[in-house]
Amino acid sequence: PDRRPPEDPITPPPPTKEEQRAGCGWRNENGVGFRIIGDKDGEAKFGEFPWMVAILKIEPVNDQDPEGQKLNVYVGGGSLIHPQVVLTAAHYVATAKTLRVRAGEWDTQTTKEIYPYQDRDVTHKEIHKDFNKGNLFYDIALLFLSQPMEMAPNVGVVCLPPRNERAEAGTRCFASGWGKDKFGKEGRYQVILKKVEVPVVDRNTCQDQLRKTRLGRHFMLHSSFMCAGGEPGRDTCRGDGGSPLVCPIQYEKGRYVQSGIVAWGIGCGEDRTPGVYVDVGNLRDWIDDKVAGRGIEPTVYTY
């Protein structure tokens, strides 16, 4: 018999074929490997949404010493649409100078996860030319990374919808994110990735609901937005700006398409007011154009 002492008992078996499926958009509904703690309400499992990334800003610990020790400050969420390209909201990244993207993260307080996270620096960003900080129209950006992420059970790409395709009203989708504040020991943020299930809301219904808020009765929902949520207590503030809203692809169990990017909301899951998301299908042409402009094939995120 093999008398060698067992290695670290948390080492998982080699990933099975199932975990590394070809193509975009595969959610690991039961997580990757195993979990030691029981599932908590609203927590994503390790590796459940492998396209989910954290966007970090690199800042000096001491402003007087800009070349000294650096701190990773959490800016918001994003999604991997290609091993080297991240989709996010423009208002989080428009003014930031040095950004870094972390894929495969789950619990931000520990590095003991079974598969490591991967960090890459952002070398180029594309902000939509019509992005407007005041009203957040066209709140979309692409971040191009210094090197591709390595695909792994906890790191994968999401699919994007065909141009102008919207998820049908009532479709139950997932938003995910780590909450606000900063990465690291000082910050108060969601330590473990959170998820919230929200139904897609028809645009007219959404506009009517939003007119009952402080936006007033003449509010017009811009074509670059879509809506989801509005169920009491299902709080989309958990999903950060920039984070993906993913919806199931019909007839392909376990496969998801990114219909929205978390943009803004009024209050938080109160009074049945839906959350507002950037409409990804409506901006698919822009995404394809910018990605192809940097020599990358849009086929990676096409299903």
Swiss-Prot record:
The keyword Cell wall biogenesis/degradation does not apply. It is found in: Secreted. PROSITE patterns: TRYPSIN_DOM. Residues 36-292 form the Peptidase S1 domain. This is Phenoloxidase-activating factor 2. GO terms for molecular function: serine-type endopeptidase activity. Residues 1-24 are annotated as: Disordered. Its main location: secreted. Heterodimer. The gene is LOC113510063. GO terms for biological process: proteolysis. Disulfide bonds join C173-C247, C206-C227, C237-C268. Binds and activates processed prophenoloxidases PPO1 and PPO2 and thus is involved in the activation of the prophenoloxidase cascade probably following the recognition of pathogen-derived products. Binds the A.niger cell wall component alpha-1,3-glucan, a fungal pathogen-associated molecular pattern (PAMP) that activates the host immune response. Keywords: Disulfide bond, Secreted.
